[in-house]
């Protein structure tokens, strides 16, 4: 699918370019051409609908709540989620921690909390907020935070 979209973009660019050895049209310097070229380049990358924050959260909660989720899918989902430029909402982390508990994977649960702390970066107020929101789940599932385990100290 991506390859087809790239082929369409390359084909549309070839239509705009002059033949090799031919002089560029004088209209290329006009603002109309630049606007057309800008619109054309935007079209190449703007297909598909945009997902709202609520839809994004629901998609990930549903993913981690699948009853047949295995350890590989859990790690794959977390790696994908970590790749986004955001800190996951507490409800997504809650679903991921519950998946860890279903899989009896304590190490992954602690690693998820470490990743959330890392994703919060220099914003020191985010991680305590997330732990505060997750505290009932952590207590229910018997999951310790990295700080409670002493993993935050070198």
UniProtKB/Swiss-Prot annotation:
Q: Which UniProt keywords apply?
A: Acetylation, Heme, Iron, Membrane, Metal-binding, Mitochondrion, Mitochondrion inner membrane, Phosphoprotein, Transit peptide, Ubl conjugation
Which Gene Ontology terms of cellular component type are present?
mitochondrial inner membrane; respiratory chain complex IV
How this protein is processed and modified after translation, per its record?
In response to mitochondrial stress, the precursor protein is ubiquitinated by the SIFI complex in the cytoplasm before mitochondrial import, leading to its degradation. Within the SIFI complex, UBR4 initiates ubiquitin chain that are further elongated or branched by KCMF1.
Q: Where are the transmembrane segments?
A: none
Q: Where is this motif: SIFI-degron?
A: 2-21
Tell me which InterPro entries the record gives.
Cyt_c_oxidase_su5A/6, Cyt_c_oxidase_su5A/6_sf
Protein origin, superkingdom: Eukaryota
Q: In which pathway does it act?
A: Energy metabolism; oxidative phosphorylation
Phosphothreonine PTM positions: 145
- What topology in the membrane does the UniProt record assign? Peripheral membrane protein
Its family? Answer: Belongs to the cytochrome c oxidase subunit 5A family.
How it assembles, according to the record, is: Component of the cytochrome c oxidase (complex IV, CIV), a multisubunit enzyme composed of 14 subunits. The complex is composed of a catalytic core of 3 subunits MT-CO1, MT-CO2 and MT-CO3, encoded in the mitochondrial DNA, and 11 supernumerary subunits COX4I, COX5A, COX5B, COX6A, COX6B, COX6C, COX7A, COX7B, COX7C, COX8 and NDUFA4, which are encoded in the nuclear genome.
Q: What does this protein do?
A: Component of the cytochrome c oxidase, the last enzyme in the mitochondrial electron transport chain which drives oxidative phosphorylation. The respiratory chain contains 3 multisubunit complexes succinate dehydrogenase (complex II, CII), ubiquinol-cytochrome c oxidoreductase (cytochrome b-c1 complex, complex III, CIII) and cytochrome c oxidase (complex IV, CIV), that cooperate to transfer electrons derived from NADH and succinate to molecular oxygen, creating an electrochemical gradient over the inner membrane that drives transmembrane transport and the ATP synthase.
In its UniProt entry, what is this protein called?
A: Cytochrome c oxidase subunit 5A, mitochondrial
């Amino acid at each position: 699918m991506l390859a087809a979209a790239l082929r369409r973009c390359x084909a549309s660019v070839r239509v705009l370019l002059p033949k090799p050895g031919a002089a560029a049209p004088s209209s290329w310097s006009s603002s109309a051409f630049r606007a057309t070229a800008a619109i054309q380049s935007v079209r190449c990358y703007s297909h598909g609908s945009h997902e709202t924050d609520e839809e994004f959260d629901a998609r990930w909660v549903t993913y981690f709540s699948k009853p047949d989720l295995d350890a590989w899918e859990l790690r794959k989902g977390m790696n994908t989620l970590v790749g986004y430029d955001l800190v996951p909402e507490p409800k997504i982390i809650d679903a991921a921690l519950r998946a860890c508990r279903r899989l009896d994977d304590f190490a992954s649960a602690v690693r998820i909390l470490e990743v959330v702390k890392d994703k919060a970066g220099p914003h020191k107020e985010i991680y305590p907020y997330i732990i505060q929101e997750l505290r009932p789940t952590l207590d229910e599932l018997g999951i310790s935070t990295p700080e409670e385990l002493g993993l935050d100290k070198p």
